[in-house]
């Protein structure tokens, strides 16, 4: 759905492992890396869209992850004219996104890039939370910085027992050390 200002409603996903490393997917047949993301369908909430995109692009189900938080407002980026589909030209400017920070409760073997007929990624890796964004397409970099910065305060949120939502008793202001990255190729 495109709003009256020309922005398509979308969700972005920052997925953390137990070391606070983030999931990066390599765009199929391209050299760019990105976080999972996708459009919100009519009648779908941002959270429902996030779970659908997580399953379609990464193969993870709701029980594989814990929601740590989301951005307070929509983050927007404009898409350069040469990237806009012909039938969208004239009324489409770009994307507006709600970003979710998730903790993987499962393991690496739960990730599958081939759960849909049209995979988005052909490889994936874990990388430090704060990493240079040169491998991200240029027009998305500022939104990535905004989302990572806003959600960084949640990095040290401890694992929460299933069904418990009492985050208010924890102090999430500190940040811990990050380690190197590991890469995974599509099977």
UniProtKB/Swiss-Prot annotation:
Transmembrane segments: none annotated. Its EC number is 3.6.1.-. GO terms for biological process: mRNA catabolic process. PROSITE patterns: NUDIX, NUDIX_BOX. The keyword Signal does not apply. GO terms for cellular component: cytoplasm. A motif (Nudix box) lies at residues 38-59. Pfam families: NUDIX (PF00293). Keywords: Hydrolase. The keyword Transcription regulation does not apply. Residues 6-149 form the Nudix hydrolase domain. One of its GO terms (molecular function) is mRNA 5'-diphosphatase activity. It is an enzyme of class 3 (hydrolase). Gene3D superfamilies: Nucleoside Triphosphate Pyrophosphohydrolase (3.90.79.10). Its cofactor is a divalent metal cation. SUPFAM superfamilies: Nudix. Coiled coil: none annotated. Belongs to the Nudix hydrolase family. RppH subfamily. PANTHER family: M7GPPPN-MRNA HYDROLASE. Accelerates the degradation of transcripts by removing pyrophosphate from the 5'-end of triphosphorylated RNA, leading to a more labile monophosphorylated state that can stimulate subsequent ribonuclease cleavage. This is RNA pyrophosphohydrolase. The lineage of its organism: Bacteria, Pseudomonadati, Pseudomonadota, Betaproteobacteria, Nitrosomonadales.
């Amino acid at each position: 759905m495109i709003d009256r200002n020309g922005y398509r409603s979308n969700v972005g996903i920052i997925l953390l492992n137990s070391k606070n490393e983030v999931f990066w997917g390599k765009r199929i047949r391209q050299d760019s890396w990105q976080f999972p993301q996708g459009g919100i369908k009519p009648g779908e909430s941002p959270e429902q869209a996030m779970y659908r995109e997580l399953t379609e692009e990464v193969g993870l189900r709701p029980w594989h992850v814990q929601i740590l938080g989301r951005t307070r407002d929509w983050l927007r980026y404009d898409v350069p004219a040469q990237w806009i589909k012909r039938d969208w030209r004239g009324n489409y400017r770009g994307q507006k996104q709600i970003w979710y920070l998730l903790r993987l409760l499962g393991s690496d073997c739960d990730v599958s890039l081939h759960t849909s007929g049209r995979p988005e990624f052909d490889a994936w890796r874990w990388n430090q939370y704060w990493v240079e964004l040169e491998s991200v397409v240029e027009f998305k970099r500022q939104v990535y910085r905004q989302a990572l910065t806003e959600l960084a305060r949640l990095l040290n949120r401890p694992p929460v027992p299933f069904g418990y939502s009492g985050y208010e008793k924890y102090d999430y202001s500190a940040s811990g050390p990050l380690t190197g990255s590991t890469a995974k190729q599509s099977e």
